[in-house]
Amino acid sequence: MTSYMLGIDIGTTSTKAVLFSEKGDVIQKESIGYALYTPDISTAEQNPDEIFQAVIQSTAKIMQQHPDKQPSFISFSSAMHSVIAMDENDKPLTSCITWADNRSEGWAHKIKEEMNGHNVYKRTGTPIHPMAPLSKITWIVNEHPEIAVKAKKYIGIKEYIFKKLFDQYVVDYSLASAMGMMNLKTLAWDEEALAIAGITPDHLSKLVPTTAIFHHCNPELAAMMGIDPQTPFVIGASDGVLSNLGVNAIKKGEIAVTIGTSGAIRPIIDKPQTDEKGRIFCYALTENHWVIGGPVNNGGIVLRWIRDEFASSEIETAKRLGIDPYDVLTKIAERVRPGADGLLFHPYLAGERAPLWNPDVPGSFFGLTMSHKKEHMIRAALEGVIYNLYTVFLALTECMDGPVARIQATGGFARSDVWRQMMADIFESEVVVPESYESSCLGACILGLYATGKIDSFDVVSDMIGSTHRHAPKEESAKEYRKLMPLFINLSRALENEYTQIANYQRSLSSKK
């Protein structure tokens, strides 16, 4: 008899629910989107109840069509770094403040420079940055005392969902390790981090393993979802670490690279590790599996900007012919040889997280001459996104025990043959595209199989996930990229002061509008 499992991924723009067989075959998937409220350049919030309804409705839609396929468990993936302040009556005092919200930038800088931030990072694994709940809660406590005085708890979006489902405040080690407030070695809240934020452990949820199982879901909500209230719920982990599981990047020497709107690069190691230079994160998958890596802000958004600003006429033609606009862009880029004839693009259109951790860093072209044309700029932009990921990769290799054998590539960019080959050439490594497209949902379910005792290791993953494309590096292209990479890296280091100056100038213009 076939058994089924349901993976739910609470993302920044939508919640996805996927019903799988226990062999990993997709039975059905549903996605429900919601708004990200960005009234100004620094604010990025969501309505937590819209997200909660998306969880209920996406599950209900699947179960309405498959009432005979009750899942043996439901397991969760979630975006990281969100903060919701809750009052004494368990009602939200704030919206869901997302990872993309930069209002705590001033406090992140203060924590890093004046409050022993680097040592806190080394213990907690989360770089000191406005994305981190440590920075966000510190900002609320200091800048919004009218909220802080009423706040009983500071929680993330998955905690909000579980509070409604099970009437408990619980947070898994994975999401907690992305808050900047959990000691990675003791798996307890870090006293110094909490002191910086001005809170106590009572302000935070109870820490539990990513394999923790919850029963007795609220009967009314279970009925709305179309599931048995006794269905086991596995709390799961964060979307990033579960994506590694879902794309089969879990063995030594394997790295997962994702480029969607933003991007990330992540291997798994067996014990927590941080970086003396503060360039990378370290987040929990289980107590014996840790994901190190770096998130980048500038992935597909760079391609979208290039599409809109450099290729509007070509895109209009593509639309009329029914061709994917992004295929047109990569075809244009193919007209130019690797290295874009010496044109470099630093792709920092949205500031940058890893490896620079500088929200002020802007994008720029370098090496532009009269001989460069539009196609050079398009190719340079595509290469710039991969160059930037490669700089994060260099930091990671210092923390890895052994060479990289294979890159598992996912996200929208993995659909592009040109971009995949570019990555193989720049990284000088084999690039494989796994069959799994809903990697975080599948990763959540694989963790659920492990939590419920249906598997005793993650080795089964390779049987669930095939591959669709493979690319080996081309030496001729790799040789050109080897010459250009040091330039790309050295420029971003050399211009640090100028980045701040131009950002201050741009902010002064905004304030005059």
From Swiss-Prot:
Residues that hold ATP according to the record: 16, 261, 300, 412-416
Top-level taxon: Bacteria
UniProt-listed GO biological process terms: D-gluconate metabolic process
Keywords, alphabetical: ATP-binding, Gluconate utilization, Kinase, Nucleotide-binding, Transferase
EC top class named in words: transferase
Single GO molecular function: ATP binding
Ubl conjugation recorded as keyword: no
Reactions listed under catalytic activity: D-gluconate + ATP = 6-phospho-D-gluconate + ADP + H(+)
Pathway the protein contributes to: Carbohydrate acid metabolism; D-gluconate degradation
Keyword ATP-binding appears in the UniProt entry: yes
EC number per UniProt: 2.7.1.12
Activity control, per UniProt: Catabolite repression by gluconate.
PROSITE patterns in the record: FGGY_KINASES_1, FGGY_KINASES_2
Similarity comment: Belongs to the FGGY kinase family.
Stated name of the protein: Gluconokinase
Native source species: Bacillus licheniformis
Lineage, highest ranks first: Bacteria, Bacillati, Bacillota, Bacilli, Bacillales
Gene: gntK
